[in-house]
Amino acid sequence: MTNDLLIKNITKNVAFSKTELEEFTQLFYSKSIKKKEFLLTQGEICKFEGFVLEGCFRIFIIDKKGNENTLYFAAKDWWLMDIDSFMNQIPSNLNMQALEDSKVLLINKQDKIALYDRFPKVEKLFRIMSQKALVSWQRRLINNHSFTAKERYFHFIEKYPDIASKLTDKQIAGYLGIRHEFLSKIKRQS
């Protein structure tokens, strides 16, 4: 069943009854995305919060010079969304591109709010998930300011070997905030 991974993900944070889980998962809909296709592009309004069942996504922005800067990756068993666009219903600054054929479960804002109203523990679930996401972002910011590009590169490939194996050097460089040529130099020296 496609919802098994979602159920496992949410129940590691908050306990739900079987009935609650059925109602929770019924509000998600499945979407398949082919490699290199976009789930969201800059300028669109993000109308979903997503959970990755299969595959991997790169979430990135395009700067004024046309460079792609990767903010994060979302692999199997990870959540993805543009929280600013989703919550405020404003155009997104983000692009979400599948790095391989992928499948996601999506929930729209209206249904998510209905879950909050129906099951107060859903708010607790998403609060816990938001706190974990903030911790992750804080660690990433600290690493970006505390470590050299070489240290960040080795930390990334050590922590996320499965994701790193799916990426081009240009995509890794965009995530690390360095030029592709500099990453090539780091790899040659290692």
What is each stretch, according to the model?
Residues 39-44:
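Short phosphate-coordinating micro-motif centered on Lys-Gly-acidic
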Residues 30-31, 47-52, 71-72, 175:
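His/acidic/aromatic-lined binding-pocket segments of jelly-roll/cupin-type domains
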Residues 147-190:
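Phosphate-/nucleic-acid-contacting segments
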Residues 6, 133-142:
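Short, Lys/Arg-enriched N-terminal segment that forms or immediately precedes the first helix
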